[in-house]
Amino acid sequence: MAEPRAVLKQGNRNRDKDSVGLGNRLRFVSISSALNPMTFSSILRHLQTLPLSKDLREKLQKRGHVQLSGLPRLPKGLIVSSLAQSLEKNLLVITATLEEAGRWTAQLELMGWQTVNFYPTSEASPYDPGRLESEMVWGQMQVLAELIQGHQVKGKAIVATEKALQPHLPPVATLREYCLALRRGQEMDSKSLELTLARLGYERGSTVETEGQWSRRGDIVDIFPVSAELPVRLEWFGDELEKIREFDPASQRSLDDLTGLVLTPTSFDQVIEPALNAQAIDLSAWGEDAETEQLFGKEGLQRFLGLAFTEPACLLDYLPTETVCVLDEPEQCAAHSERWFEAVAQDWSALQLPNLPQLHRNFSALGDRLKTDFQYITLSEIHEANGDSLDISARPIPTMPHQFAKLAEILRGKREIYSGLTLGQYSTWLISAQPSRTVSLLQEHDCAVQFIANPRDYPAIEKSQIQRTAVTLKYSGLAELEGFILPTFRLVLVTDRELFGQHALATPEYVRKRRRATSKQVDINKLSPGDYVVHKSHGIGKFLKLDALANREYLMIQYADGILRVPADSLDSLSRFRHTGTRPPELHKMGGKVWEATKNKVRKAVKKLAVDLLNLYAKRAKQVGYAYPPDSPWQQELEDSFPYQPTPDQLKAVQDVKRDLEGDRPMDRLVCGDVGFGKTEVAVRAIFKAVTSGNKQVALLAPTTVLTQQHYHTLKERFAPYPITIGLLNRFRTASEKKEILAKLKSGELDIVVGTQQVLGTSVKFKDLGLLVIDEEQRFGVNQKEKIKTLKTEVDVLTLTATPIPRTLYMSLSGIREMSLITTPPPSRRPIKTHLSPYNPEVIRTAIRNELDRGGQVFYVVPRIEGIEELGGQLRQMVPSARIAIGHGQMEESELESTMLAFNDGEADILVCTTIIEAGLDIPRVNTIIVEDAQKFGLAQLYQLRGRVGRSGIQAHAWLLYPNQKQLTEKARLRLRALQEFSQLGSGYQLATRDMEIRGVGNLLGAEQSGQMEAIGYEFYMEMLQDAIKEIQGQEIPKVEDTQIDLPLTAFIPSDYIPDLEEKMAAYRRITSIESTDELPKIALDWGDRYGMLPSPVEELFKVVKLKHLAKSLGFSRIKVEGKQNLVLETPMEEPAWKLLAENLPNHLQSRFVYSAKKVVVRGLGVLAPAKQMDNLIDWFGKMQGALPETKMETLVGK
């Protein structure tokens, strides 16, 4: 599910184009949520006016220290924010754990700070030889980048764990030397920039897609700073930096102009290594492993920080002095720190390097720094009655879901909330995701309460306060809020937890803000020498190389009987041969009979499929179903209470579903998206509409018990504020429970039932079933599928699947099979930290222990069942405290399901299994996966396995273990090195999902069609299916596979314009695979933006492509010169079709075109120069387009 990007500072909303200050130009670390950062601003204003707040301010300024106790988390944030903001100071909050820091950050974002930054730290030992995870380092750089420039930072809040107080950074002055400030208009040799970028650790490539990369094309340099949200494009005029612009990493298009930016190093190693070299320190004497260094480069130089610098720094060294520091729960911070200190001290001793400077300090020494250098506040939830501490004595509000009469009496002061405590004279605030409903429910019981939509409408809020009217504010964020009473401040706050019993739907976790090229559509047809390709006329061949001949470039394709040269501008007649088999395909002979026979056989099968699909669509169009009314206010309220920002894909899927429900024929829609991409929320909204707007019953069907449990809990939580009843039907229900559920379904007392295939049993009778939601239909058996098929004619059906469905298939079937695709990944998905290691029991023990220490669970995956029980025994010896479960495909289904459910419920810590890990299962606590013998798995398999972790926003780890390096082949070694570089949601991930898409086609279209697809390759099959559907729908212009242009033209991409071969191939692919000629100006703009002004051969290439596109759409297969005077258009079209086209030409031109069988002669055009011939044909073909059916016109020429 995609979380929103909260706009947390003015600089993000109205960005100041003239300021170089990093605060305005670079975005910093944030946990995003669908919230108004000013939600609590009116409560903060109110707190600041109270006498007790004034006393606390004076005490803090006079003594430099305030100690508060008796405070839960939310009032802690409110009180310290009001104090720091009234003193016009920044805020640093130190917590004991990462989880607590995440919660603090989510709450501070509601409290009016200009920026709220989470400063990420590692729980690992500073002496760990592994490299620090990039995401964490970049997150630190984002926070440090602003602080290091010495600008007057105002309105800034930073949250970190006590690890941020440990020495883990280079000195401030040293790091500042490694930061490069760039300004528009400054003189700088672009060559010296290259040297600086290398010094800062930036890697040069052909395209910039992710942090730490840079590329150069002439006078244009692209860089993705690790401390920024977007990459930047620098343009030079001579030695002057003329332009600085952000650009979108997905489209590579330029965006906003900037006046300046600051580049930080990509990691701290870039700062540490030169310091070590300057002192001529030989790292081999300090435990650096030569073999590891040879394979992966120098790793983890942070453990030598003390050798490089006599005084390593911590976060406090970088803070402005105008900062109030808050130590939250000092006892817990101390305990957590001391446990870490003891473990790390043992690691340091085990190194047996007594002269290696220590990078661990005990907590009391760290606390002294806080007390001497800053004003600081300590906070404790436990009531303390000592002289130094002020006990705020906060009280919780008892949870009383749906007891509005009782709550109204309490808020009016007519009933005691605790013995001797009434709230009649208290300032009362209600924070709710359903504010209008909350207000109306309380007003029914004579409670004075008002909803104020704008939390900064201070006059209206103050007026309500004077009139003793409770103020209700809207909130739908991620922070878990609990109501409280502050007797010392005479303030009470009530949340949805007390009103409806509704808990937060998710725990906020740290996510570094950035926009990466995750949405970038990877060019699946990107060809490399050695790839197998399919040519539409000749079949399967092997791509050898790109070759220049005369004025054009050609792809050399190896066939069984020789080499075929394909012009680069005809690249659309080729596609990569993609199939699911592992054996290389046999090469065809050029123009051979075998390929023609295969094509004809597949074409017949595809036509039959198209006819079947269209018949099914026609049948469904005649059925009549229940038409639901438009959305109710409750529907709007439920959707507003969703704590994440829905992605555009999600919103479109919801609109599609609602349109189906409000239509008068039964819905049968498929929603497709990976686990965690938000399919369930689409279903939640549909279910709610069916129950509340249509008074219908709903059944949600899932293939496994574990999934039913997850869906049941989601619905219970989302629908808590509403009078909706939900039942769960699976094999863990007792006979009496099942009997009660069945009776309530029959009588209509139960609105929703969630269950496995039992829901389809003959004993299940509904009073009025309106909607059936099916999760992963392809995983049900034949009998269940038949029952579902009969239900589909009677009720609305919504099917969810996590198997990717390719967009090409989606486009072909749109209008025939209702499908919605959710392809946008959630920004909260943190890239998984991948570790490569030779098999080592100590590495495994540490990885498991680290995960269990933070309350998580572990998948341990092996490639085979043999020896799995023994492995379980070995793990028990390594980690005696761990509870271990074992799961594999040869277990009884019920036993395997019980094991998975127990693991899901946290009854086991480690699941030792084969690759059967549940594809649709979402277990947020599993954040470490260990894969033994990683070299035995394919890349796509490893991606799928790795994708089982990292779902909750917590940093996940994947350990890929391989045998001793001497046993590895060179190929396996290279693959493992490449694996370490892959990012979970980057291009490699998309390539792996494309392999799964082929399975998705099989699931959707059946086994026979899968076989046809294997024969001719996936891409060509999809094209045939689209053509068959169009043909049956009545398009008369003949289809030609390619248009050959035999005119003496100079049309190609010169090597000095796009030097990189891979980029050049991608450029040819992009320009030749356009859907509409409208795309060409945009491509020309993009190329001009990225590579500079278009040279003449490239302009000619654009015209050739436009001509080909128009000619192909009109059914012309070849354009050639005939004699000295004429041009010939070869075509399979019949004369009536030609007459239809010719009618669209002006009268004076019609006589120049002469039709005869299989060709049209254009008289007199041959005497003109080739470029002029092309211009005339483009103009005339454009006129002929008017004869095409309107739908096809829109597809080809653009709407």
Curated annotation (Swiss-Prot):
GO process terms (BP): regulation of DNA-templated transcription; transcription-coupled nucleotide-excision repair, DNA damage recognition
Domain Helicase C-terminal: 847-997
Any single Gene Ontology cellular-component annotation: cytoplasm
A Pfam family reported for this protein in Swiss-Prot or TrEMBL: Helicase_C
Location(s), subcellular: Cytoplasm
UniProt xrefs under CDD domains: DEXHc_TRCF, SF2_C_TRCF
Residues annotated for ATP binding in this entry: 673-680
Keywords per UniProt: ATP-binding, Cytoplasm, DNA damage, DNA repair, DNA-binding, Helicase, Hydrolase, Nucleotide-binding
Predominant localisation class: cytoplasm
Class in the EC hierarchy, top level: hydrolase
Residue ranges constituting the Helicase ATP-binding domain according to the UniProt record: 660-822
DNA repair listed as a keyword: yes
HAMAP family tied to this protein: TRCF
Family, per entry: In the N-terminal section; belongs to the UvrB family. In the C-terminal section; belongs to the helicase family. RecG subfamily.
The protein's name: Transcription-repair-coupling factor
Organism of this sequence: Synechocystis sp. (strain ATCC 27184 / PCC 6803 / Kazusa)
Lineage: Bacteria, Bacillati, Cyanobacteriota, Cyanophyceae, Synechococcales
